[in-house]
Amino acid sequence: MQYVMGRTNSMTRGFLNKRRVLEKCRTAKQKIHYCISRYFHYLPPVLAILLPIGSWPFLSEQQWWYGSFLFPVVSSLGWLFAIGRRERQLRAAAGQLLEAKIRKLTEQDEGLKNIRETIEKRQKETDRLKLHNDKLVEQLGQAREVFIQAKGRYDHMEELSRRLKEENQQLQIQLEAAVRERNEKILENQELLQELKETLAYQQELHDEYQATFVEQHSMLDKRQAYIGNLEAKVQDLMCELRNLLQLEMGAKTNLPGKPVASRDVVAQLVLEFRKIVFRVETTEAADSLTALRYTRTDPSAHNYSLACRQLFDGLREENLGMLFIYAPFAQRVLFANALFNDWTGYGLEDFLNRESDVVLEGFAQWERDLLTESRVERSGKIVIKTKAFGATPFYYCVVTLDKGPFAQHILGVLYPAKASFFTNLSYI
């Protein structure tokens, strides 16, 4: 049915288009014939005007004459004006003559008058019907175009509906497959969840058993480590007391340097040996060997610091490089000074830091400035000390601010005799 309707519409459109083309061709031919028959008598004067104008570019200056050009132009214009005016007169006269003859004929014959009136009425009716027919033809063309557009839209909508229907079917199939897959995944997830719950319950039981065992063993380990820690602390205290007793027994027998050093190499060797002591002091840490203190829950920082200081002081007492000391500049307090201060000079380190004691005879300003400086760079110099046994004696000194270790930000220093004769005089005492 749709095919037959489409075929009929296409034939109708073809017929109407053909009829419209033929009507346009006939109208164009009538217009061309009317123009030629009406304006043919104007052709000669127009040629008379165009001929001199068209030949003007091809004439030389000697052949051209203004009068000969102007005369044809003016005469042609006059001819055209006269012909046009005469034509209008003749046309008006012919119209008046024709009307007069028709009026005379119709006035003389009543039948012709009636026929004329009838013809005029029919002519008016014909004109009206022709206008109405033209309007109907135009409306028919518009309706045909609207119908064609509607038919195209209908075909497009029908094709779109067909495609949407196919896509809907495909989406429905995909949706059913997705729902099926989702149901399978839900069943699988439920099974996995059940297995996971059982596994978690079993692991929780194992965790509870392991936790109880761990707490019990940890409690036993804490008791054993506390007992071991107490024993090690007692051993360390006994070792420190034994070392102190041995040092007190050997108090008067302080080890002196074996061989005096040449004066030009004293400072270099003093700094070299002093750097070794500085490295050992900065790398001294708390007593990490106390395994009991590692595992117990008590804070070992205070015990470790005091033990480290005791061990460090014991090590510095055994050094025979020179008069070693540790000084806190921010508190202006001496923390450590070995026994060589009293053995060599007869004074304590506090006397070296007091300007009014007159122990430092020369270089006190530089000595005090180096002690109060916070720079990490080694500072060395020379001062003259008033000793009780030998009087004024020059000493080299080297000081540095410790960067780390138990005594960070403290001053570590050493003093050494500048003359080798000092040890010779000391051996006679």
Curated annotation (Swiss-Prot):
InterPro entries: UPF0242_N, UPF0242_PAS
Pfam families reported in the protein's UniProt record: PAS_12, UPF0242
Family: Belongs to the UPF0242 family.
Protein name: UPF0242 protein CT_616
Organism annotation: Chlamydia trachomatis serovar D (strain ATCC VR-885 / DSM 19411 / UW-3/Cx)
Lineage: Bacteria, Pseudomonadati, Chlamydiota, Chlamydiia, Chlamydiales
